[in-house]
From Swiss-Prot:
Catalytic activity of the protein: RNA(n) + a ribonucleoside 5'-triphosphate = RNA(n+1) + diphosphate
The protein's role, per its UniProt record: DNA-dependent RNA polymerase catalyzes the transcription of DNA into RNA using the four ribonucleoside triphosphates as substrates.
Cofactor notes: Binds 1 Mg(2+) ion per subunit. Binds 1 Zn(2+) ion per subunit.
GO molecular function: DNA binding; DNA-directed RNA polymerase activity; magnesium ion binding; zinc ion binding
Native organism: Carica papaya
Protein's recorded name: DNA-directed RNA polymerase subunit beta'
EC number(s) given by UniProt: 2.7.7.6
Quaternary state and interactors: In plastids the minimal PEP RNA polymerase catalytic core is composed of four subunits: alpha, beta, beta', and beta''. When a (nuclear-encoded) sigma factor is associated with the core the holoenzyme is formed, which can initiate transcription.
Names of required cofactors: Mg(2+); Zn(2+)
Amino acid sequence: MIDRYKHQQLRIGLVSPQQISAWANRILPNGEIVGEVTKPYTFHYKTNKPEKDGLFCERIFGPIKSGICACGNYRVIGDEKEDPKFCEQCGVEFVDSRIRRYQMGYIKLACPVTHVWYLKRLPSYIANLLDKPLKELEGLVYCDFSFARPITKKPTFLRLRGSFEYEIQSWKYSIPLFFTTQGFDTFRNREISTGAGAIREQLADLDLQIIIDYSFLEWKELGEEGPTGNEWEDRKIGRRKDFLVRRMELAKHFIRTNIEPEWMVLCLLPVLPPELRPIIQIDGGKLMSSDINELYRRVIYRNNTLTDLLTTSRSTPGELVMCQEKLVQEAVDTLLDNGIRGQPMRDGHNKVYKSFSDVIEGKEGRFRETLLGKRVDYSGRSVIVVGPSLSLHRCGLPREIAIELFQTFVIRGLIRQHLASNMGVAKSKIREKEPIIWEILQEVMQGHPVLLNRAPTLHRLGIQAFQPILVEGRAICLHPLVRKGFNADFDGDQMAVHVPLSLEAQAEARLLMFSHMNLLSPAIGDPISVPTQDMLMGLYVLTSGTRRGICANRYNPCNRKNYQNERIDDNNYKYTKEPFFCNSYDAIGAYRQKRINLDSPLWLRWQLDQRVIASREAPIEVHYESLGTYHEIYGHYLIVRSVKKEILCIYIRTTVGHISLYREIEEAIQGFCRACSYDT
């Protein structure tokens, strides 16, 4: 839930009926408790004022105008001398009208109803906890059949003590023959349970720790059995094991969060504050109302009817009561999620009513559009492009975006360095884009991380921190390895950039949100910063080299420069020797001077490593020199031996691309080792 002072956290979950009552109930100065909505009315058609105990009641939700009660009396808000603080005639407190944005009410349901999110949504949490098929639970909730209620230490007519056996509908026709009407009602209320009340009884009797222990024991037994050889049976066992794992995780979550399973069955239905479901008067005197008001009215109408059947008339047939309970359940289902059970409810113009789920979910819902998607200061947006020369923790920020985001910091820097006398002069320098501006901007950005976010933010890697650097152009540059965490592509995707202002936010960005600290997937633990797409193609081109071996390369006339434009004469053709280099720096220098190509084969001097030499491999060629030394040429390496056959040096056959990749890997390993040595 939200802290009332700092507003730093939000938790969404199940609440107890006591908590709902505590949110909605208010004690007036005269000791009267208000909060329950009992009437389905909104405004009086003559006075245009909210109906008492209705959906817009001022006693429950507060006054429409600050300090003015329903009678029209006025009191100064917060004045201790003014007494009393509420109107004794209408019972409305003299408080600020903004209370109608957060003051809730509740409807006391005449029968328990299941929360449709936890029954019908997949996976069904109620079905998982009770380990029963969803269709049977739906039939029980909507009064299609019943089960025998066990009664401890009492004799039962059905003699099914301690068991929950579902009965077919024949009990409605066979069992009543043994009773009078009054006797059958007593028997049904005592030994038969149906509707959401039956679900609530079963959930209340659950021991979550026993569920975890038994589920683990069954999962272990299924794992020890091994495959049966029957593909259908093996799939069935696999599905059962997956279900047991989900059931254990669900039970652990209930224990960890101190939530009782029976809270998934509602006894009190919360009523939203009136300002969140308004009625607006438009031109011509017509009224526009939120769809939720109509759905609330439907619930109250049916609930009041059920209350009358249960309290005023003792001779009401049980079938009629069960039918009315089903109607109340369906009305609450429509309020929470219209259309989840089939055809949605529509108005007179054949328009589907927007339920509570429709209001909060989706791209246009309350969270994504109003709370998460709203415009904020110190933020910008632009297209992302690949920045292969960037470090993993850096991003390229265009100058136009950077100067706008860090404008206040640049102004402070200009004034501190006495380059501007006041804010107006500093803004003038920024508009004229003087060279000193970019120098100060560089200094400001060096120690200030930024947050990059790509919508939709489906997991925590959807927003990460980077160290910004200035780049030319109008696009944000990103390292290609962070693409997968954002689920982004460099084909026109846009990302938002935010500047953390407080020291706490900057510390959190540096310690938890930097991209080089989020290399593993938080869901499964696998590496998420892995080469994909362009990087794989680049690595392939870098390390492909020539496909021809040393022999084919030697006598292939295609090695001659400009061979397409010259006449090939095999008799006058001379082989161009593959160059020798003492170290990788000389090889890369030759490539930069365009003396060799990226995939040109070359000989690179290597350390005396016996692992390079194949013991049983015969040399392809042996070259002797005048001093007695000779070269043994193999497929991928070359050995220089002395007169005494001692190894003087070894050369390996490689390319500039392989050398570049090796140097990058070696540098990364050395950096990792240095970091580990610092930690120890």
